[in-house]
């Protein structure tokens, strides 16, 4: 993994961060059975180790070095996410962040230019703002920018114009990852969050 392109490690981190935020969001208010409750707790290990080790892990990968930081990031990216996916019910595996990805890839050429995990990380910002967590969104935007993950539609080569995003917004709110969430989310809510992400100062 230390010899692999850095961009794939980075994208893996973005997808892994999504696991933490989406699992906690989708499970909110539910009385979880043991397996799903355990998986949700393990999802913390998809987040906190990356806060500590992600930047150093990318630096190690850049220099083809298999050090402690890279090891911890890989454990989060592969082991922690795998355990969560196996333990929780499917309805707790994804939420807004992944649905944002599946909406945006409807745009011509978008998927070819943006890795899955990078877009999921952007989707985390959208999810946080939909949920009213502006300060957390600012904190996460700063973190993602430090990892060199694109944090706006403009950076990803897409327009934030409502008409351009018409099909995208429909897919986001009607996609299968949105079937089990704590409250109804509308196209207006998602679009407003996307606009805020563009302007958010992290």
Regions found by a protein language model. Give the residues of each.
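A glycine/threonine-rich phosphate-anchoring loop and its flanking beta-alpha core
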Residues: 1-42
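Active-site segments that bind and position negatively charged phosphate/pyrophosphate groups
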Residues: 32-143
């Amino acid at each position: 993994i230390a010899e692999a392109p850095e961009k794939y490690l980075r994208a893996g981190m973005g997808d892994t961060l999504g696991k933490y935020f989406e699992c906690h969001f989708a499970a909110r208010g539910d009385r979880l059975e043991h397996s799903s409750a355990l998986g949700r707790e393990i999802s913390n290990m998809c987040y906190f180790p990356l806060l500590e080790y992600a930047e150093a892990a990318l630096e190690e990968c850049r220099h083809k070095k298999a050090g402690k930081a890279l090891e911890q990031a890989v454990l989060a990216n592969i082991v922690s996410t795998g355990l969560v996916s196996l333990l929780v019910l499917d309805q707790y595996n994804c939420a807004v962040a992944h649905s944002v990805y599946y909406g945006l890839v409807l745009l011509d050429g978008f998927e070819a230019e943006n890795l899955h995990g990078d877009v999921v990380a952007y989707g985390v910002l959208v999810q946080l703002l939909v949920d009213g967590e502006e300060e957390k969104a600012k904190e996460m935007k700063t973190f993602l920018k430090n990892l060199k993950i694109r944090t706006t539609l403009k950076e990803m080569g897409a327009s934030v114009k409502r008409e351009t995003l018409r099909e995208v917004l429909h897919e986001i709110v009607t996609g299968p990852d949105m079937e089990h969430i704590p409250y109804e989310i509308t196209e207006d809510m998602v679009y407003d969050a996307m606009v805020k992400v563009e302007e958010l100062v992290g």
